[in-house]
Regions:
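An alpha-beta-alpha
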Residues: 44-86, 191-210
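Short acidic capping loops at alpha-helix termini that bridge into adjacent secondary structure
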Residues: 56-58, 88-91, 141-147
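Flexible loop/hinge segments that line or gate small-molecule binding clefts
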Residues: 2-45, 125, 151-163
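Alpha-helix capping/helix-boundary segments
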Residues: 5-6, 65-66, 73, 125-127
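Flexible loop/turn connectors
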Residues: 108-210
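Short beta->alpha junction loops
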Residues: 91-100
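Hydrophobic alpha-helical segments within soluble ligand-binding/sensing domains
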Residues: 33-60, 99-109, 127, 168-187
Length: 210
């Protein structure tokens, strides 16, 4: 699971022909075997589910990180909103990881004043912070805000509320990662012939809400 600044660490491994598989994220300019989620498609579908529930003024909360999975989720949101004719509502709040909690609190308070109806969160950690901020500000879910996010969090079970979340195929990820890595170790796959696996995901509707 490479970070945005890990290219300089990965290249020496490839030069030494050490078996390597990227999981969850890719690095621009480095072609190595990978098992990834189709973040654009899944984010598009997640946003579409909110639209089908009747929401129109939908914004997104994301991280200000240059990571391929985060960029893909942002692209999927924007693409879906454009296709639905909701370009005028497209707005991505990019927050710093170490300041996300305080920043999101302000985002939620301001969003209510502007009439925002729903949010897509790029990660479940952001969603938990967003939900906490919503309740601290005296708002409710889904009456005041609709929520859609990537991945489940145990905190969702604590909040008696309705939301949409992406359930990633973790078992499929594990099987493909092991299959590719074992193949590299055995020499079944020619070095440099990178195999790229892209998986879909399930969208879960927790509760019967709007």
């Amino acid at each position: 699971m490479p970070s945005g600044s890990s290219a300089q660490c990965v290249k020496p491994l490839l030069d030494k022909r050490i078996p390597l598989v990227f999981f969850d994220r890719a690095i621009d300019g480095i072609d190595t075997p990978s098992v990834l989620l189709n973040n654009v498609m899944v984010s598009h579908s997640l946003t579409q589910k909110l639209i089908e529930k009747g929401y129109r003024f939908i914004e997104m909360v994301s991280y200000s990180m240059d990571l391929s999975n985060i960029r893909g989720r942002e692209d999927g949101y924007k693409e879906c909103m454009r296709e639905a004719g909701l370009d005028c509502f497209v707005n991505i709040h990019r927050v710093e990881h170490h300041e996300s909690s305080s920043t999101i609190d302000g985002i939620m308070a301001d969003a209510r004043k502007r009439g925002v109806e729903a949010f897509v969160f790029a990660t479940n950690a952001l969603a938990v912070q967003g939900m906490s901020a919503i309740f601290r500000n005296g708002f409710n879910i889904p009456q005041d805000f609709g929520i859609a996010t990537f991945d489940k969090n145990d905190a969702f079970d604590i909040y008696a509320t309705d939301l949409l979340y992406v359930r990633q195929p973790l078992e499929s990820f594990a099987k493909e990662l092991i299959r590719i890595l074992v193949g590299e170790i055995r020499g079944d796959q020619e070095f440099g012939a990178a195999e790229h696996i892209v998986l879909g995901a399930e969208i879960v509707n927790k509760g019967a809400g709007r």
